[in-house]
Amino acid sequence: MGLSDGEWQLVLNIWGKVETDEGGHGKDVLIRLFKGHPETLEKFDKFKHLKSEDEMKASEDLKKHGITVLTALGNILKKKGHHEAELKPLAQSHATKHKIPVQFLEFISDAIIQVIQSKHAGNFGADAQAAMKKALELFRHDMAAKYKEFGFQG
């Protein structure tokens, strides 16, 4: 399941573009997640009151959380699979405190791919998409393994 050096380079190249506007990308990822999978919104007490896409777009808190999500993921991606130190606290909080099912990580991974595709189509061709999908699968696989260590079947 590991990525080649070339695949990691594709992932990190496109991630550099994401980092130029983490707030915009992050908000768009969360909106896409919540609109595509409304059940995910139930895990976010802070955002449950946001019913329309316009309310979500106007939410500074949603933007801040989007930055938090993408910053954490970016730190993990930059480790090129050697992300134990970064992954463990994230998995622990998501398993024991937030109780986020692994399936929701799949949903947000899909939203990330879709947002990058919509914002950076010219830089996110088939090879880069395949590499990013592989990197996000590795992330989810390792999160699921950590969940089990924390006794959460998610």
Curated annotation (Swiss-Prot):
Gene Ontology BP term (one): removal of superoxide radicals
Binding residue positions for O2: H65
InterPro entries membership: Globin (IPR000971), Globin-like_sf (IPR009050), Myoglobin (IPR002335)
Example of a GO cellular component annotation carried by this entry: extracellular exosome
UniProt keyword annotation of Oxidoreductase present: yes
Residues where Phosphoserine is found: S4
EC number(s) reported in the record: 1.7.-.-, 1.11.1.-
Residues at which nitrite binds: H65
Sequence positions that bind heme b: H94
Reaction equation(s) it catalyzes: Fe(III)-heme b-[protein] + nitric oxide + H2O = Fe(II)-heme b-[protein] + nitrite + 2 H(+); H2O2 + AH2 = A + 2 H2O
Matching Gene3D superfamilies: 6.10.140.2100, 6.10.140.2110
Similarity comment: Belongs to the globin family.
Subunit relationships: Monomeric.
PANTHER family (UniProt xref): MYOGLOBIN
Name of this chain's protein: Myoglobin
